């Protein structure tokens, strides 16, 4: 069995009851223990909770939003919806796909082997903007001076974990060195 089965994104053009009935079948068959959502808006999470209740099935137990110092949008409605409905929050990418490690300098070409240096579209279309890189460098300096040498990636992860709505984070290191750091 799977402990947690995630619905990774919303269903355009699909009735909400259909995927929830499929999840209920998996739950009843013992193939999954719990289910959760990733990348859903707060109103949609609330709708899922209510629909699950109408179907007499368990609701989601966990939500996996993209949340970090550079992307605080989940604070607008997702975190509140999760708290209201008793859903655990386990954000992914607390260091913004590496930008909040401080390894990317504004105006500089990213090093080969890095996510941005490899041309990963997810980072290049989202976090890899001059203003985000400048914010990361300012935070890096702050951590080195004011926080007595705390690494920016540790500070950024601790910042996410300091939110009362957050249960844990998904760190997502790309290399063993990043994991041991």
What are these regions (language model features)?
Residues 1:
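An active-site-proximal structural segment forming one wall of the substrate-binding cleft
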Residues 4-5:
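Acidic/hydrophobic-patterned starts of short beta strands in beta-sheet-rich repeat architectures
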Residues 10-181:
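Beta/alpha (TIM)-barrel catalytic core signal, keyed to glycine-rich beta->alpha loops juxtaposed to Asp/Glu
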